[in-house]
Each structure stands twice: as C-alpha cells, then as structure tokens.
Amino acid sequence: MRTIIEGGDDCEVDPTRVAMPTMIATHQSNLRMYCDMAWTKIITSSSFFPSELQSVFSCFRGRCEEEQKADLSENLISASIFLRFLCPAILSPSLFNLCQEFPTDRAARNLTLIAKTIQTLANFSKYVHLLLHLKNSTFFIYYFK
C-alpha cells in the first residue's frame, strides 16, 4: 500500500479521465504492475488467514458439496473474502491500519482501480462495467485469458 500511496504513478485507464490519451498504455502498465504486487502480497499472506474464517469457509464448502454445488463454493468463498476483507483494505488502507495518512486523490483513484481489478479476478468475472475500456487491451487479456 505504501508504494502505491507514496508513488507518483498514475493508473488511470478511463479515456474520459486522462488528459493525454497517449499515456493510457503507460497507465495500463502501471495498473498491471500494482495489481501484480497486490496479488502477490495477498497470495503470500495466506498463512495469516484467521483459523476461524478457515473453519467457516471449510464448512461452507462442505455444505455446497453436499448440495452438489461444489463449483459454486469456490466462487462464493473467493468473492466473500475479497469483497468483505481484502478489497475494502485496498480501498481504505488507513481504516485498516495499513497506513496512517489518507491517500492523495490520485493514489485513492489508483487504489480504487486496483481494488476493482482484484475483485473482478476474485469473482472470476470477465470484466467490470466501469473497466470496459480495458476489454480490448493487452492488460485485459493478460488477466482474463
């Protein structure tokens, strides 16, 4: 979070919000880099996942399997973890004691774009309505092969 908040990079990929459209490719590259960083941090921190939540989600998975809906359990568990815990922490790191200061407007927008992308991955979705402008980009293809 600190790298994103303190860095001066721009991840804006919405053409209506970019003053110089020629910079969109650079912004996409920045967004991909920060999403990769966030994803790596999430994956490498799995050992810190609370055992109580592991138990709850294990029971949930078992119930889904009993109902012949095992494939649904992964989507629901992933969406729940990211929607309720991880993406809110990305969006508002100061509320989760991940940083002390409030981010600048640019950093807040970068965090929003990162959280939206990560949530989309967690939902196993093809795209988010607000990120439709990424649909044909190499960034989009990179994540949603």
State where each predicted segment sits:
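Extended alpha-helical scaffold/tether regions of large eukaryotic proteins
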Residues: 1-145
